[in-house]
Design a protein with these regions (language model features):
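Conserved loop->alpha-helix
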Residues: 1-196
Length: 196
């Protein structure tokens, strides 16, 4: 489980693709805290570190993960949001993020708004059904609040801290983002749907 509070922006050093998926090598200042077998959210997708050293870690992504997330487009040089799994002693400062990406959205508008920046992200109906204004959403692993909602999009407002500490500060029109909807909304739908 994760919180959506990014701990580091890592640098993709290599992506080795094969018939089975991809091995991704990421350099990070968190390297000393990562051991083989640890779960780490990479742009919001939960991956397992298979190797770790003083400079970073490697993780494998299956073809299904590459197809259902924006990780399939990663290349060497890309910057990725990183968050190690939540420990029992950690504070839950964001919202409950599982690292199970529900789909991919695309940035369709970027607008400066005083000291903040608003991102409008196009979402399919399978994602919008779980979105409510002032509700939680994770974009590339970042815990955010939905500021506005349309028929085909959700908009979030990024404060300077988020712009500085995550890769969303570089988000431009056309960028694909991993989207994880609020797990509480999914459980409510499931429970009420079974009763109907």
């Amino acid at each position: 489980m994760f919180t959506g509070l990014i701990q580091d922006i890592g640098a993709v050093e290599a992506v080795e693709r094969s018939a089975d998926g991809a091995r991704i090598r990421i350099a990070t200042s968190l390297a000393s805290e990562i051991a083989p077998g640890d779960s780490i959210a990479v742009n919001g997708a939960c991956l397992t570190a298979s190797r770790a050293d003083a400079a970073g870690f490697e993780a494998e992504a299956m073809n299904q993960t590459l197809a259902l997330t924006a990780l399939g487009g990663l290349e060497a040089g890309d910057r990725v949001n990183l968050e190690p799994a939540l420990r029992a002693s950690d504070r839950l400062g964001g919202h409950i993020v599982q690292g199970h990406v529900d789909g991919v959205g695309e940035v369709v508008a970027v607008e400066e708004d005083g000291f903040a920046r608003r991102l409008r992200v196009a979402l399919g109906p399978e994602l919008l059904r779980y979105a409510i204004e002032r509700g939680s959403i994770a974009l590339d692993g970042v815990s955010l609040t939905i500021a506005d909602l349309g028929d085909s999009w959700a908009e979030v407002s990024l404060i300077p801290e988020t712009l500085e500490r995550t890769n969303l500060g570089a988000a431009a029109i056309g960028r694909r983002l991993n989207v994880e909807c609020d797990v509480v909304a999914k459980y409510v739908e499931r429970l009420t749907g079974e009763r109907a």
